[in-house]
């Protein structure tokens, strides 16, 4: 079983491809400067050699597509076919209070996650672009969301409440989340 993990940031995408039978990372890398001049993919080949591939990457969808194509590239890839990928995991930044554990991404989950965009305006939209790009290229692959905010959902209220009017917490969900 092979699992691809993506971390889509505001101007970057990091990835690792895990072979769960051997419990090894078989491919890893990252795209930097998405939407800027001089964007590139830095990757580590299965033999440990590091490479930099320069490419104009104007947005995340093209970045995810470039990563997937690189994974199956005869010169740089770690797998022969995208069919070898059994699931994709996504680091998702702010899931509000709704997501206290990892979840299978579906329409309802993505709508609820989108509703949290104001809480992480640089990261949540980028996370969604990664999910949508994978859905377009690998429509039958299960995708899992792992939320930064889930790690601290068990804190007592006195530990996560800010000294602000309680109505702001109720209306906007503003609370200590310890992300970043």
What are these regions (language model features)?
Residues 3, 12-58:
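Short glycine-rich, Thr/Ser-proximal phosphate-binding strand/loop in the N-terminal lobe
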Residues 37-86, 116, 130:
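Conserved active-site "lid/cap" helical segment
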Residues 77-123, 151-159:
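Short beta-strand-loop/turn "lid" adjacent to the catalytic site in phosphate-handling enzymes
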Residues 1, 129-130, 138-140:
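Non-transmembrane, aqueous-exposed alpha-helical and coiled segments at domain scale
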Residues 3-5, 87-89, 144:
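Short glycine-aspartate micro-motif
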Residues 2, 72, 154-160, 167-177:
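Membrane-proximal intracellular helices of multi-pass ion channels
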Residues 180:
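Conserved small/polar residues in nucleotide/adenosyl-binding loops
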